[in-house]
Amino acid sequence: MWVYNNWSSYDELSDNIPLTEELAMKELHEMIRLRKFGIHFDYYMMDAFWFAPDGGYRTWRKLNWPDGPDNWIAACKENGLLPGMWFGTNALVHINAAPQWKDSVGTSGWTMSLSEGGFLPDFMSVLQYWYDRGIRMFKFDFAYFDAATAETQKTMKPEEIRKRNETALRESLAKFRAKNPDVMLVAFNGFGGDVESTAGPFPFHNPVDLRWLTVFDSLYSGDPRPSDVPEMNFWRSMDIYSDHMVRRYEESGLPLERIDSTSFMIGNTGTIYYRKTNAWMGMLLLEVARGGWVNTIHGNLEFLDEAKARWFARVQKLYAPLEAEGRTKAFGGIPGDVEPYGFGSLDSTGAIYTVMNPTQSVEEIELPLLSRVQEPLGGGRVIFRDAGFVPEISGNKIKLGPGQLAAAGFGRYAGPEFDLGVEEDVQIPRSIALVEARFVSKGQNTIEATFTAPPKGDLRIIFQQRNSDGWITRSWPGGPPKGKSVGTVLKIRAEQNGKELPIATDYDRVIWSGLSWGAGEIRRGDFAEGQALTVQCSSAEKSPMKLEARVYSVEY
């Protein structure tokens, strides 16, 4: 199932690009354009902030939607698309409490109880109102089950309040589904899981209640953001974040097919770090390789030209039967623990293994059998890879370069017709070696190493910060559009013979989710071999931080 969501083509949280009817209709026309290249969508999800602040989710913003949603709903129907709508569940985000909700407003002033007052009954009538007008998918975001009025907080424990709110919503949604059996319900923020970091403890502090699967078709596993795994390519660290969260949700008991990684997001807005289509091929491949039955595509579809659209359609067609089989398995280590891992999908004719090496070394990864009836692996072929390092397959093992993504086909999928090419946006070194560089403290939150520059290769510097308790810690100098770039806090400097050396970086961005690391490279032609070279890594955080750094020699 393929869902187009227009978030990141606009952004009203970390940017100033509003949702308008013109923008929404433009993306609908792009969906139609992409059909001629073979791309298929089932749903069009209208994301956040379509609603008038005082309309109780029944009216649309007049300035941006002078005629309401009628034209959009009609155009979806005319073109065989099922429309969907975003709702902030019980949080007052860019919306005011309607009169009938006010006796549900909790002590926070911006969340509403789901088990007392008039909010939930009215909210369910809102959902039915939009279903009757043709809406077939409903997205639930920003759920806060701790919401309670002052009177309730005096008589009930927090865990009792949470349980009562969750039960009230789940039972109401079950009745809504029973009345409208063709509806799609998808859950986002607030329904369990800790999505802020890949370095957090597990099991989740906020556990996932598997009973939500009785009413929701999918649960999402976090908005795209960089992981706490440093990578020279910023977008690769984001791939690792989504992979990690899918694995953690699976470990929490969710089947892979019920997890929506929501990882594919293109756009030129703050929410997606002004990515446009950088490293988009690997992002799409991983979206389908993880095995989710709900595949959500976000952003500016006009960024997909004919060549990109045809490649997109090939991936979509390739994985359609594999996803339908529901025989996708995760294997290997945990992404956030910087261990090689992958996802394998199997049918009766063969298998595709999509494999990631998040480490700063060349690694050989064993590809496990995905089923007891699967034939031993042999005759495999690399059908997709990043540029640079050429992966090697030997029997049931594949060798990958540092930070590399690749896909290997076996059986029918080893045929040349399944070749997906090379991701040129991600360059992987053909060799990497650790340089002996001993970092020492040079004052608060600053470390430095002086070493002899190696005779070959560029120099790669990787560093990360931890708090005084040893936990990996993100710096957040402000999100877009007015925040500062993370490079103003997490800094890498290098000099040789009294001259500062240029350092190529990809991490120095305005990042709404924060960042815990820095990565940079000094090109071979910018330093002299055999002479002393000094590298300094620092954090401008006011609290004491523990910094860790490594230097590598890399050849492309």
Regions found by a protein language model. Give the residues of each.
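C-terminal beta-sandwich/jelly-roll accessory domains of carbohydrate-active enzymes
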Residues: 328-339, 348-350, 355-556
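Active-site-proximal substrate-binding groove within the catalytic cores of carbohydrate-active enzymes
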Residues: 168-391, 395-410
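Short, acidic/polar
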Residues: 17-37, 117-132, 280-281
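Short, low-complexity, polar/charged sequence segments that are solvent-exposed and flexible
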Residues: 23-26, 63-65, 102-106, 204-207, ...
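Aromatic- and carboxylate-enriched substrate-binding clefts and catalytic-loop regions
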Residues: 40-264
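Conserved structural scaffold segments of CAZyme catalytic domains across common CAZy folds
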Residues: 1-94, 294-296, 300-336, 345-352, ...
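Hydrophobic alpha-helical scaffolding
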Residues: 17, 21, 62, 116, ...
